[in-house]
């Protein structure tokens, strides 16, 4: 079946009406959800996959035969596939995640499932960080969870899961003084898709780090989205 993807810019207060319209949209089979609607949409669809229910966020919706909307969260899977394509394996490694919202939560969950040894969590909103910390602590008691460290020495993976680097947001997700301790061996990833080379990735590349862009994560999950 031939399909077309149509970009739709929805205001936050119009999400309810938009999803209600989708239920009666006869030639619509699914929707991709992006910032800032991933958590809001999760609360409004009719059904969630077990993964999306745990994370309370979605980035893809499909319409079931009876018209109900089902949501799933594939950002974590996409991130893992993109990282593996560059040769990064998280098992036994140490990671730092900045941004504990919808996409960050999905990435953190995926890293824990893949056997990450230690994971530092950072978010500008302490409540958001604590919510993810508690979720992971209960589900993955073997993973060492911590707050923002004093140095990035020894960190194998640094992930920006926040909007930092997008137009209108802070350029860097972490203090410059902390970033100045970044090792060249660290794998640095960003979820921001535009610009492709964010300020964080540009800085990391200049230090000799291997970098993973937002579009790489997005493209890695496209097949899974189509199959959902």
Please place each PLM-identified region on the residue numbering.
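Phosphate/diphosphate ligand-binding glycine-rich loop within oxidoreductases
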Residues: 1-86
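Conserved beta-strand positions in the Rossmann-like core of class I SAM-dependent methyltransferases
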Residues: 6, 119-120, 212
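Active-site capping/gating segments
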Residues: 81, 85, 193-194, 209-228
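Conserved S-adenosyl-L-methionine
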Residues: 113-118, 207-209
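NAD(P)-binding Rossmann-fold cofactor-contacting core
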Residues: 116-136
